[in-house]
Amino acid sequence: LLKEDCFILHLGGGRHKFIKGIKNSYHSFEKINENDIFDWKYRKSILNEFDTSESNILSVASNQRIIHDFLYEDIVASPKVYNARRTKMNLSYRVGKEKIITQNLQMEIDYTMELRGVITIFEGKNGFPENFAVYQLFHPFKYYSILKEKKKLDVEQITCCYVLRKKERESSVLRLYNYTFEDENYMSSIKLLKNAQYNLIKR
């Protein structure tokens, strides 16, 4: 696939499509500036480092108010929280020059927060990979965009947040990346809003 510059997109119902142009489907994580790297003091709980599941990664980031600081610059903010769910939807959008049409495409949304009309969709991963498949964020983004367009949700803005965690000795380092899409019909229109790194320091 790398040699042929191709990637695979799921279309739903067990169908897939080969698309030319890997750059249109994978996005490299941006470098985090030194000014956006913070030492975050915390009191370790029993389950903080218990496992390395995606759910645990997002729970740690939320329980330690890191997400609140990063997204809202307010550790006492009280966003509504919606846990992992799966849903299916028909989608139509573009990737590069290709038009993609899906039917009953199943997508998994790891975590969702809403505050003052801003919906943020989360994806969590272990380690610090160089890049990620954009559809992981775009499909849920498109899902909520459709609901907004149909006036089923009163939404001001839709963003996505990628949370990465790497364990170091008895602690962790978390990197957060907040994205949106400038064109809800074009998967390659991903845009970074901000990013930051939090080094968990035990009290």
Protein language model regions, located:
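Charged, terminal alpha-helix-loop-beta segments
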Residues: 1-203
